[in-house]
Regions:
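Conserved N-terminal structural module of periplasmic/extracytoplasmic solute-binding proteins
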Residues: 2-119, 138-140, 186, 336, ...
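Paired acidic/hydrophobic, glycine-rich loop segments that form the ligand-binding mouth/hinge
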Residues: 108-111, 289-294
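C-terminal capping/gating helix-and-loop segments adjacent to ligand/active sites or protein-protein/ligand interfaces
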Residues: 384-440
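A ligand-binding cleft/hinge motif common to bilobed small-molecule-binding domains
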Residues: 116-121, 295-309
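Extracytoplasmic/periplasmic substrate-recognition and gating elements
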Residues: 265, 304-369
């Protein structure tokens, strides 16, 4: 079975719906994938006197689209910024590793996806600038867990080589009309209280929903989506703090798998695979009442559920905070202008710029200092009944535990979902059979 790359869907899919999402944010000031390469944003051509900084990204990263390059160049007339973009991270990242290995072909600033940052900090930190020492960078302005992700292990020097651009704090998006029809509250505060602090309460709410709603209206979109959210709320997941793979013996991982499997065995799942046409149609048809949703998914839901879903969908706090998604900027030492590039990377990821990126592109800030800025603190989403998404997702982001991210986290997570849980959800296999199938696939992938 081909393992589906859930992680890569995020950047491409968000870019397609970010314009709609931004239009629905009731903000004070308030996409589509680029070609293989995109030139300087608003910079005059042929200006030989300007120092050119290059930025390499994947997908529609948002920095250029939000006008941040233009703003920086206006503030720094001697700087010209050029961006190149490769559409998919699975093509971009191997090239980045190759270029880091040779020290050639690198942009002055390179983007790194969260699923790759552990490998970068563990194996490439010596080739990257310590951005934690860049003037203007304040560790206290960033979420501790995000800062930790971009920092190399102590055994590798402990340098902070990646500055976070965005994150994906999760809530629970739900159909309030379906909740109310099943005798459950529709108000987001009351809904969040149903399962506050315990994912098992989310399961019990699903059982109560099914008892009234009956067959044909599933409670969740997929068991895999539940598993990812539950696993993401644990401090230790697939690796321990010594870098050892421990998912097989970690009770948090097996517990998340078994709990998610219960949504399938109890008949609460719509048995859909995320980011497939069937899943998209499920939003349009109202085939399920809830989905674990990171901040960036709201625009996707709006796009797929369409006008008919406006004011029917809402968003509440998840049982426990977790995160899905996010990226970083790194500065290779081999670059021609490493010092100037570090200053640009620091500016692009500063709280003020992250707030602008959220306002214009819907990318949720990884700098906690941005949460007090009006563009974030006052953000509401018209499609989701005016939900105070700035408040909801800021609270979730600040509660995410500092987690150990391993170099093969994505491989393990994909196989648990697409090999293990999918068999339970769609094929009726027992949870034990699904677990064993996933372990076998992971062992093969990791050559264990």
């Amino acid at each position: 079975m081909r393992v589906r790359a859930r992680a890569r869907s995020r950047r491409a899919l968000v870019s397609a719906v970010s314009a709609a999402a931004a239009a629905s944010l009731l903000l004070s000031g308030c996409a589509q994938d680029p070609k293989e390469a995109s030139g300087p944003s608003g910079a005059p051509s042929g200006d030989k006197a300007r120092l050119t900084l290059t930025v390499g990204v994947f997908g529609a990263f948002g920095l250029q689209e939000a006008g941040l390059y233009d703003e920086y160049m206006a503030q720094n007339p001697g700087i010209r910024i050029e961006q190149t973009s490769i559409e998919r991270n699975e093509n971009y990242y191997p090239q980045l590793l190759t270029h880091l290995g040779t020290g050639a072909g690198l942009a002055d600033i390179q983007a790194v996806e969260v699923n790759n940052i552990a490998e970068i900090t563990a194996t490439q930190a010596d080739k990257l600038v310590d951005l934690g020492k860049t003037p203007g960078v304040d560790k206290a302005a960033y979420l501790p867990w995000k800062w930790a992700q971009g920092t190399a292990p102590a055994s590798k020097g402990g340098a902070t080589v990646g500055l976070g651009t965005d994150i994906g704090p999760q809530g629970i998006c739900y159909r309030k009309d379906l909740f109310e029809a099943a005798g459950l509250p529709g108000d987001r505060e009351a809904v969040g209280a149903l399962w506050a602090g315990d994912w098992n309460k989310y399961l019990e709410t699903g059982k109560a929903y099914k008892a009234k709603a009956g067959d044909g209206k599933a409670f969740v979109d997929s068991a895999s989506g539940v598993m990812a959210a539950v696993t993401g709320s644990s401090a230790q997941r697939f690796y321990d703090d010594q870098g050892k793979v421990v998912y097989k013996t970690n009770p948090a991982v097996r517990g998340a798998f078994d709990l998610a499997a219960s949504f399938a065995t109890e008949g609460l799942s719509a048995k859909l695979q995320q980011f497939t046409p069937g899943w998209d149609q499920g939003f349009a048809n109202g085939s399920f009442a809830t989905v674990s949703c990171p901040a960036w998914m709201l625009g996707y839901i709006q796009d797929k559920a369409g006008p008919a879903g406006k004011d029917k969908w809402d968003v509440a706090q998840a049982p426990k905070p977790s995160n899905w998604g996010g990226s970083f900027l790194v500065v290779p030492k081999a670059g021609k202008h490493a010092e100037e590039a570090a200053r640009l990377a620091a500016w692009l990821t500063a709280p003020a710029q992250q707030a602008k990126l959220f306002e214009k592109r819907g990318s949720f800030p990884s700098a906690s200092a941005a949460y007090a800025l009006p563009a974030v603190s006052g953000a509401q989403h018209a499609y989701f009944g005016g939900a105070p998404i700035g408040e909801i997702f800021s609270k979730a982001a600040q509660g995410v535990p500092v987690t150990v991210v391993g170099p093969k986290d994505l491989v393990i997570a994909q196989n648990l979902a697409d090999i293990g849980m999918l068999q339970v959800d769609q094929k009726g296999r027992s949870p034990q059979e699904g677990w064993e199938a996933a372990v076998k696939a992971i062992d093969n992938a990791l050559d264990q």
